[in-house]
Curated annotation (Swiss-Prot):
Protein name: Probable molybdenum cofactor guanylyltransferase
Residues reported in the UniProt entry to bind GTP: 10-12, 22, 68, 96
Essential cofactor(s): Mg(2+)
Chief location category: cytoplasm
Top-level taxon in the UniProt lineage: Bacteria
Enzyme Commission identifier(s): 2.7.7.77
Any one Gene Ontology molecular-function term assigned to this protein's record: metal ion binding
Gene Ontology cellular component list: cytoplasm
Family: Belongs to the MobA family.
Catalytic activity: Mo-molybdopterin + GTP + H(+) = Mo-molybdopterin guanine dinucleotide + diphosphate
Pfam families: NTP_transf_3
Lineage start: Bacteria, Pseudomonadati, Aquificota, Aquificia, Aquificales
Free-text function comment from the UniProt entry: Transfers a GMP moiety from GTP to Mo-molybdopterin (Mo-MPT) cofactor (Moco or molybdenum cofactor) to form Mo-molybdopterin guanine dinucleotide (Mo-MGD) cofactor.
Residues given in the record as Mg(2+) binding sites: 96
């Protein structure tokens, strides 16, 4: 277990396309969010689940369920909240990413430097599977206040250690770690790739 990093799982999405709460969708005998938690528990004993309704995730033992500080529907709110709960670098992941490979997480943590360490896949940053330093808090607040509340815009204002797609494929050849679930069909499709 690694105590040099904390983990924050963002569970604040609305699951509109999923038609139900995807974080609680059961496959392989457990809710999706529990798959994410179990993958990441080997990296830190400090795992937080950030959501608008923290009581919903109290069933996950060893996780700390916390409420989003800001009352806005935006993933930057979860990142902002994370900055208040830790003083060390932290891994941020989406609750709808149940196929994360441990080797990829390990690679990211080992290569973390600057304000953020983020993979760039197919020309786009992957901010919901990345390592951040809590010092980014003020820049997040500025982005939200200036109505530039998107991860892609925020990243342009951060000092980022960019990891390449080639580096990602060296530890996750199918890039399954970056698959986020939006429909029940996604679960089946990505499950078949990951197993």
């Amino acid at each position: 277990m690694n105590d040099t990093i904390d983990v924050f799982i963002l569970a604040g999405g609305q699951s509109k396309r999923f038609k139900g709460d995807k974080t609680l969708f059961i496959f392989d005998n457990k809710p999706m969010i529990e798959h994410v938690f179990e993958t990441l528990y080997s990296f830190s004993k400090n795992i937080y689940i950030v959501s608008k309704n923290p009581e919903k995730y109290l069933f996950i033992k060893n996780a700390k369920s916390i409420k989003d500080i800001l009352d806005i529907q935006n993933p930057l709110s979860g990142l902002y909240t994370a900055c208040f709960y830790t003083e060390k670098p932290f891994l941020l992941v989406g609750a709808d990413m149940p196929f994360i490979k441990k080797d990829l997480v390990e690679y990211m943590i080992r290569n973390h430097k600057k304000e953020a360490t983020i993979f760039k896949i197919n020309g786009f940053f992957e901010p919901l599977l990345a390592v951040y330093d809590p010092s980014v808090k003020d820049k997040i607040k500025q982005s939200i206040e200036n109505q530039r509340a998107s991860f892609q815009k925020l990243i342009l204002n951060l000092d980022v250690n960019v990891l390449t797609e080639e580096q990602a494929r060296s530890v996750d050849k199918d890039l399954i770690s970056f698959s986020n679930i939006n429909t029940k069909e996604d679960v089946k499709r990505f499950y078949n790739i990951g197993h």
